[in-house]
Amino acid sequence: MVDFGALPPEINSARMYAGPGSASLVAAAQMWDSVASDLFSAASAFQSVVWGLTVGSWIGSSAGLMVAAASPYVAWMSVTAGQAELTAAQVRVAAAAYETAYGLTVPPPVIAENRAELMILIATNLLGQNTPAIAVNEAEYGEMWAQDAAAMFGYAAATATATATLLPFEEAPEMTSAGGLLEQAAAVEEASDTAAANQLMNNVPQALQQLAQPTQGTTPSSKLGGLWKTVSPHRSPISNMVSMANNHMSMTNSGVSMTNTLSSMLKGFAPAAAAQAVQTAAQNGVRAMSSLGSSLGSSGLGGGVAANLGRAASVGSLSVPQAWAAANQAVTPAARALPLTSLTSAAERGPGQMLGGLPVGQMGARAGGGLSGVLRVPPRPYVMPHSPAAG
């Protein structure tokens, strides 16, 4: 606190009279009263709404959550309104203290007149005749000093007491929680994903059907563009179907490769019949690949892929597709009689192993329908060369 007693009355009086006065304090008190009144009205309105939630038509868990969220805010408005009202009252106390100090402060003109009188008395005090008057003047100035100091000390004490009872204002409580905001965002995202999935389920079949059967006047690029926009966000199921089709085609290619390998192996045993059987099997495999590609193209990747376990034909320890046995029937329906062996004509039966149409006896005797095209060279007669010595 400032030591107002050490300051002359000229400074204290000048400070008190140079200020704006108590008008600003009175205006501030009125504004605080208005704020307090508005807060009380808002708190009352909020409280009535909260009470209506518990007894009105909106009753349930949502109403309970609303009451729990709004009640702290209503309490805060009531407390803040009381603090605003107290602030207005204390501002009025400070304004009253100012008015009191202002009334007790010696007006600056009076102090200036006293000082001017003192200077005159000193200037005319040639023989000491003004000494009593100078003493009286100094006593009056001392009283002015003490009066201004007392007024300032009283004003400082009153304002300190008024401001000491004021409490700091608190911020409004949060009516929403971070967890609730996160749950809301998760719910919105889940709803968006569900809507997108439903839209995909509804749009993909129609788009595929339109792509398979394009109408006149519509360019393929527009169809493909619309299909891509529809399918692009959710390409995983279609990618899986394409992958399954590729796997099936890869298996077919592997079968063709195995057929070519078997062809090379059998060329040394039965060149003509084996080559014909393997060529027929390879053609069947190619036709199977073509039918697979056409079925996938016509159904818009909608056709299923079928597979059987334990249904393959066998060549020794090698498992081969069933189509190879069917292709082998075209080589020779039944083995012919073997004139140079003890084997008789074999009756035509169902498809057996891959070498069922290539009798071993025929290969040994160089006879049979499957090997009828083998070149036979008759023995050539030996001609004795003519000797020059014989003449």
UniProtKB/Swiss-Prot annotation:
Q: Please state what the annotation says regarding this protein's domains.
A: The N-terminal region is responsible for interaction with TLR2. It is also important in mediating tyrosine phosphorylation of SOCS-3.
What are the inducing conditions?
Expression is positively regulated by Rv0485.
> Would the keyword Oxidoreductase be found if you checked this record's keyword annotation?
no
Give the subcellular location.
Secreted, Cell wall; Cell surface
**Gene Ontology annotations for the cellular component aspect, listed alphabetically:** cell surface; extracellular region
Q: What is this protein called?
A: PPE family protein PPE18
Please report which protein family the annotation says this sequence is part of: Belongs to the mycobacterial PPE family.
Q: Which phenotype arises from disrupting this gene?
A: Mice infected with the ppe18 deleted strain have reduced infection burden in lung, liver and spleen and have better survival rates compared to mice infected with the wild-type train.
Q: Which gene encodes it?
A: PPE18
Which GO annotations describe the biological process of this protein? response to host immune response
Assigned keywords, A-Z: Cell wall, Secreted, Virulence
